[in-house]
Amino acid sequence: MRIAIVTDAWHPQRNGVVRVLATLGGKLVELGHTVEVIDPGAFATIPCPSYPEIPLALAPRRRLARMLDAFAPDAVHLATEGPLGWAGRAWALARDLPFTTAYHTKFPHYIRARTGVPLSWPYGVMRRFHGPAGAVLCPSASVHAELKEWGFTNAVEWSHGVDTTAFHPQPKDFIDLPRPLFLYVGRVAVEKNLPAFLSLDLPGSKLVVGDGPARAGLMRRFPRAHFRIANGDAELARYYAAADCFVFPSRTDTFGLVMLESLAAGVPVAAFPVSGPRDVIGDAAVGVLDEDLGRAAMAALDLSPMACRIHAQRFSWDAVARQFLGFLRPFKGALTKMSA
């Protein structure tokens, strides 16, 4: 099958959405499919407000239509709700072609955190974007339930996986800091709720690995915390493995792939009992979910690294890719090319 994936999130961005899509694309190719990823790199772009490191395609509709017509896909997946996602939606609707979408990010909650607008406004925009899709792929049962509450009728559960070869237990001497070492990995932005972690009264050390618009301010506000940026996945894997506990303070993530990567490295998780952590950790003895995040972090130190590793191995990317294929809506008959 010829599969077009349209996404506003792609390399060199470093986030969970990019990792999911890049890994998915590789697995689909391994399964014998032809995959075309259409991303902002092929377009003139402008910086995203509040996220200048994220480029947004500028007026992409015509060029995107030409690219899709030339590729002649058998199925189209719109991975994000940015300019390219809307342009892909317009292309499919103009040709009366089915498509799928994905709900990777709780943009309504991010927008409310920045502007204070009621959640109903951005959720209305999200319903409009995803409404015509044959299926809206969401990464967990919790998010699926939330979308149903907001009036989505076409959402389906599509879990994520982890590369247990890349992320695995390693010696902890990579980091020379007082123990225990409490780690956060990910974007350093307001929606990640990092002050909830960095303000905790914990023994040992707190380490943040990642970059983002809130990094400089948090470094000034929490001078006793340590901040690093990983140079590639191999180094990132060593940071994970060096930790004693992975602290995930976000209340707005749809999944939290970094938790799986930590578990694959044999490191237990402390988090709030919200969507994302509830779906990755559940009732397994590989993490502690508690509204008292400090208590969760201390309790997680007693959990088994081997149990963490075994739990992560349940999340297979091969299964994720095959499930994705089952959700696609292939076109009936050959695609008739149309001028943009």
Where would I find each of the regions flagged by the language model?
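Short alpha-helical donor nucleotide-sugar binding micro-motif in glycosyltransferases
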Residues: 68, 130, 238-243, 324
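Donor nucleotide-sugar binding/catalytic pocket of nucleotide-sugar-dependent glycosyltransferases
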Residues: 124-170
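Conserved donor-binding/catalytic core segment of Leloir-type glycosyltransferases
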Residues: 173-207
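Nucleotide-activated donor-binding/catalytic signature segment of Leloir-type glycosyltransferases, i.e.
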Residues: 215-234
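Aromatic "clamp/platform" in nucleotide-sugar-dependent glycosyltransferases that forms part
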Residues: 251
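Short hydrophobic beta-strand element within catalytic cores of glycosyltransferases
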Residues: 259, 264, 268-271
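A charged, aromatic-enriched C-terminal amphipathic alpha-helix characteristic of glycosyltransferases
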Residues: 302-337
